[in-house]
């Protein structure tokens, strides 16, 4: 029997599909979660969060990596670039994952994928970032570059908005886009009750389930 594939290997595979093969993120993620049915809820949640978070914050993540690496992300081998990106996302946005574990797993994955010669590079970059993350400063100029990095939105898009709206309005738009919005579920009351849906969602690990403020 083959050894079950590990979470970070799946994350790497998904992100390579998205960034290298141009497969839509939601489709690549869905395929993996459907294929590996043996994954438990915690593993599926971890894969989903790291995958979606890395994609959502990729511009910011690349900026952070480029502050500490002599080899810029654009010049890196795709596998190493993805390993660093997903690790930096965890370092910055997932406090519950120890920095040492993030670094060690990234090094292990680099070696497993045949990049033994770059494992020291991965280790050095990530441990430096882990120590100095709070020292990373956003670019001051031009404004479009700062907003692009801060909100991980392509700079050309920011420039387009700045040419049409005041700076304050653009910042509000970008901030709103980065907010986490609730997921709404519509159900057929003839087939299932609201209480049954709430119970099932909580069984599946959804921590907070609330009624819609307007709809019944």
Map each language-model feature to its residues.
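Class I Rossmann-like S-adenosyl-L-methionine
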Residues: 1-216
């Amino acid at each position: 029997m083959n050894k079950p594939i590990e979470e970070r290997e799946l994350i790497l595979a998904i992100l390579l599909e998205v960034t290298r093969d141009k497969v839509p993120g939601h489709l690549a993620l869905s395929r993996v979660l459907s294929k590996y049915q043996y994954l438990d809820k915690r593993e599926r949640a971890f894969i989903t969060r790291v995958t979606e978070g890395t994609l959502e914050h990729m511009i910011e993540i690349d900026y952070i990596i480029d502050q500490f690496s002599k080899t810029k992300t654009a010049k890196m081998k795709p596998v190493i670039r993805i390993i660093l990106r997903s690790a930096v996302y965890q370092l910055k946005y997932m406090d519950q994952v120890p920095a040492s574990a993030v670094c060690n797993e990234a090094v292990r994955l680099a070696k497993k994928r045949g990049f033994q010669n770059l494992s020291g590079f991965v280790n050095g970059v990530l441990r430096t970032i882990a120590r100095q993350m709070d020292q990373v400063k956003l670019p001051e100029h031009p404004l479009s570059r700062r907003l692009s990095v801060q909100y991980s939105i392509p700079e050309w898009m920011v420039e387009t908005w700045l040419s049409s709206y005041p700076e304050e309005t653009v910042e509000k738009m970008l901030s709103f886009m980065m907010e986490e919005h609730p997921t709404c579920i519509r159900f057929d009351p003839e087939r299932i009750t609201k209480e049954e849906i709430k119970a099932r969602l909580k069984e599946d690990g959804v921590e907070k389930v609330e009624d819609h403020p307007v709809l019944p």
